[in-house]
Regions:
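The Walker A (P-loop) glycine that initiates the GxxxxGKT/S ATP-binding motif of P-loop NTPases
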Residues: 91
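Flexible beta-alpha connector loops of hexameric P-loop NTPases
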Residues: 64-65, 114-118, 148-164, 203-219
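Single conserved hydrophobic/aromatic residue that forms the stacking wall/gate
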Residues: 2-7, 11, 247-250, 254-257
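Short beta-strand segments of a lipoyl-like beta-sandwich/carrier module
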Residues: 9-25
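P-loop NTPase nucleotide-binding/switch module
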Residues: 9, 28, 32-85, 101-103, ...
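Conserved P-loop
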Residues: 105-145
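Conserved P-loop NTPase nucleotide-binding/switch module
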Residues: 96-99, 104, 108-111, 122-123, ...
């Protein structure tokens, strides 16, 4: 993506050189352009985007009408998840929320699976790294790891990173959705994400709400889940971001703390 001077900035650039077709890393220079001031800029395949700002490069966002097959018969039969919709897995400690999410990530009918480990135990993430490279996707015949993105911010990592991890997963999902792919974002867990929001709010000395959570917590959560959805792109293709997250009940979260 060509560099800009700010939001909404448009100015003329001249392509100076382009590398031939082939295989390159995202950090390799693939082109050099010259701006209106005569300065050269190296262009790579790295794209930068603020994670809290939604990617809205689509023409239309219709109402979800198809089912996202999770591969778990009980969910698909009694409580189906819409493609481009949101769903959650509630339960107390030890109920198997993370195990169920791992089962869905292995069998779900999606092109890209994004797993966000937000405040979870590190050993649960290590299991994914051990299992997924060995398992084969029955739809494509490739390894499951080839379609899986893992964002690891476990409980021993900084609070700021834990807060940003969920936004990062959604932004990556929107990036692949703009390519016309079917994306499933799985966050584990949003309860610990809310705890991170509370800690950051307290450190910034913001006005506290109920149980010391941010006053605008409901708006933050609703704006985040509003970024999911089925979209029609400008080229006529359709893409989707479906969100599934685990949730621990409030009083159990406080007891755990």
């Amino acid at each position: 993506v060509a560099p800009s001077r700010g939001l909404g900035d448009v100015y003329k650039r001249q392509v100076k050189s382009v590398v031939p077709a082939g295989e390159y890393k995202v950090t390799d220079t693939i082109a050099v352009i010259t701006d209106a001031d005569g300065r050269d800029h190296d262009i790579t395949m790295v794209q930068r985007w603020p994670v809290k700002q939604a990617v809205r490069c689509y023409r239309e966002k219709p109402r979800p009408s198809r089912v996202m097959e999770t591969g778990v018969r009980a969910i698909d039969t009694f409580n189906p998840l819409a493609e481009g919709g949101t769903g959650f897995i509630p339960g107390p400690f030890g109920a198997g929320k993370t195990v169920l999410q791992h089962a869905i990530s292995k069998q779900a009918d999606a092109d890209v699976i994004i797993i966000v480990a937000c405040g979870e135990r590190a050993n649960e993430v290590v299991e994914i790294f051990k299992e997924f490279p060995e398992l084969v996707d029955p739809r494509t015949g490739h390894k499951l790891m080839e379609r899986t993105i893992i964002i690891c911010n476990t409980s021993n990592m900084p609070v700021a990173a834990r807060e940003a991890s969920v936004y990062t997963g959604m932004t990556i999902g929107e990036y692949y959705r703009s390519m016309g792919l079917k994306v499933l974002v799985m966050a584990d867990s949003t309860s610990r994400w809310a705890q991170a929001l509370r800690e950051m709010s307290n450190r910034l000395e913001e006005l506290p709400g109920q149980d010391a959570f941010p006053v605008d917590l409901s708006a933050i959560i609703s704006n985040f889940y509003a970024r999911a959805g089925l979209v029609k792109l400008n080229n006529g293709k359709t893409g989707s971001v479906t969100v599934s997250y685990t949730h621990l009940r409030a009083h159990e979260t406080e007891l755990h703390l």
